[in-house]
Structure formats: C-alpha cells, structure tokens
C-alpha cells in the first residue's frame, strides 16, 4: 500500500453524540467491503476500541508510551 492509498477519517465532538457508534459502524462496513482499517481511540475515559472487543481491557496509547518512551520515540 502506498501513501497515496491511505485515507484518514476523524470523528470528533462533545460527549454523547454518537461518535463511537458512528465510527464503529463506518469501520465495520469498510472492513466488510475489503478495506484494511485501523481504529485509534484516544479517549482515556471511554476508549471506543473496547466496544469492538466486548469490554476487554486493552493496552492503550498511554500505556505504550509509558513502556516505550515518548510518543515521538515510538
């Protein structure tokens, strides 16, 4: 995959407006169409990736940075 093929989508806004639901449904549809997708949840209080993983605790960006150094170093 070249950089020309990479697309980024951001969902943002105040809490409770459906960002997680919209992002999960959009990405699920894209995956079903054969697209390779990556979701990065950056809300330390309500990370949307746990919705896809049935509330299983996952390593977060904050944990990764704490283990490996600054985000810029990763």
Swiss-Prot record:
It catalyses: N2 + 8 reduced [2Fe-2S]-[ferredoxin] + 16 ATP + 16 H2O = H2 + 8 oxidized [2Fe-2S]-[ferredoxin] + 2 NH4(+) + 16 ADP + 16 phosphate + 6 H(+). The keyword Nucleotide-binding applies. It is an enzyme of class 1 (oxidoreductase). One of its GO terms (molecular function) is 4 iron, 4 sulfur cluster binding. Binds 1 [4Fe-4S] cluster per dimer. The keyword Metal-binding applies. ATP binds at residues 13-20. Its EC number is 1.18.6.1. Keywords: 4Fe-4S, ATP-binding, Iron, Iron-sulfur, Metal-binding, Nitrogen fixation, Nucleotide-binding, Oxidoreductase. One of its GO terms (biological process) is nitrogen fixation. Its cofactor is [4Fe-4S] cluster. Homodimer. Belongs to the NifH/BchL/ChlL family. The key enzymatic reactions in nitrogen fixation are catalyzed by the nitrogenase complex, which has 2 components: the iron protein and the molybdenum-iron protein. This is Nitrogenase iron protein. It comes from Nostoc sp. (strain MUN 8820).
